[in-house]
Amino acid sequence: MALSWVLTVLSLLPLLEAQIPLCANLVPVPITNATLDRITGKWFYIASAFRNEEYNKSVQEIQATFFYFTPNKTEDTIFLREYQTRQDQCIYNTTYLNVQRENGTISRYVGGQEHFAHLLILRDTKTYMLAFDVNDEKNWGLSVYADKPETTKEQLGEFYEALDCLRIPKSDVVYTDWKKDKCEPLEKQHEKERKQEEGES
């Protein structure tokens, strides 16, 4: 489902710096090997806010999401393993993302079309954001991710600052709830299987 991708892991159109000159933390920068190292590993989808009412309504269906990024610096791809809880059910998905280093974007093909999102690295190394449709005022949106399911007020500070810059009220923010996660048992099963495969090889 394309919308699931949009809401949890990278999508929509590129961010245009010229249209947001006052939003310092929304200015895209090239993706380097250091950037890829920084986003390697396990991440949790924390919250998002969209001006598009349809998207805002859909994110409310997402109870919890976590995923793993495994970048390939040579091929400029990222292997994604995603665990998402919707309607008290765990949905597991794997795919490859493409990295556009100079543009600071990551993309994925959905329904034969390539969708993009800008990866925005924050001051706090344990968080990052994705910017959605910032060149389309009616559909502006942001999502924030962290290396733990719970975040501090300070960690969400840059996310809130960016929302203010885009004139998206905090009341539009939809948060996930880790207590509703149903995927942790499946993740543990996958980890056990991987360790067994490594032991046999």
UniProtKB/Swiss-Prot annotation:
Induction: Synthesis is controlled by glucocorticoids, interleukin-1 and interleukin-6, It increases 5- to 50-fold upon inflammation.
GO cellular component terms, A-Z: blood microparticle; collagen-containing extracellular matrix; extracellular exosome; extracellular region; extracellular space; platelet alpha granule lumen; specific granule lumen; tertiary granule lumen
Tissue note: Expressed by the liver and secreted in plasma.
Glycosylation, residue list: N33, N56, N72, N93, N103
Chief place of localization: secreted
Any one GO BP annotation for this protein: negative regulation of interleukin-6 production
Keywords: Acute phase, Disulfide bond, Glycoprotein, Pyrrolidone carboxylic acid, Secreted, Signal, Transport
Pfam families associated with the record: Lipocalin
Superkingdom of origin organism: Eukaryota
InterPro entries in the record: A1A_glycop (IPR001500), Calycin (IPR012674), Lipocln_cytosolic_FA-bd_dom (IPR000566)
Entry-annotated residues carrying Pyrrolidone carboxylic acid: Q19
Post-translational modification: N-glycosylated. N-glycan heterogeneity at Asn-33: Hex5HexNAc4 (minor), Hex6HexNAc5 (major) and dHex1Hex6HexNAc5 (minor).
UniProt-annotated location(s): Secreted
Cysteine pairs bridged by disulfides in the record: C23-C165, C90-C183
Effect listed in the UniProt record for changing V174M: In allele ORM1*F2
CDD domains, per the entry: lipocalin_AGP-like
Signal peptide: 1-18
Purpose: Functions as a transport protein in the blood stream. Binds various ligands in the interior of its beta-barrel domain. Also binds synthetic drugs and influences their distribution and availability in the body. Appears to function in modulating the activity of the immune system during the acute-phase reaction.
PANTHER family: ALPHA-1-ACID GLYCOPROTEIN, ALPHA-1-ACID GLYCOPROTEIN 1
This protein's domain notes: Contains a beta-barrel that binds various ligands in its interior.
Family statement: Belongs to the calycin superfamily. Lipocalin family.
Protein name as it appears in the record: Alpha-1-acid glycoprotein 1
Naturally occurring in which organism (per UniProt): Homo sapiens
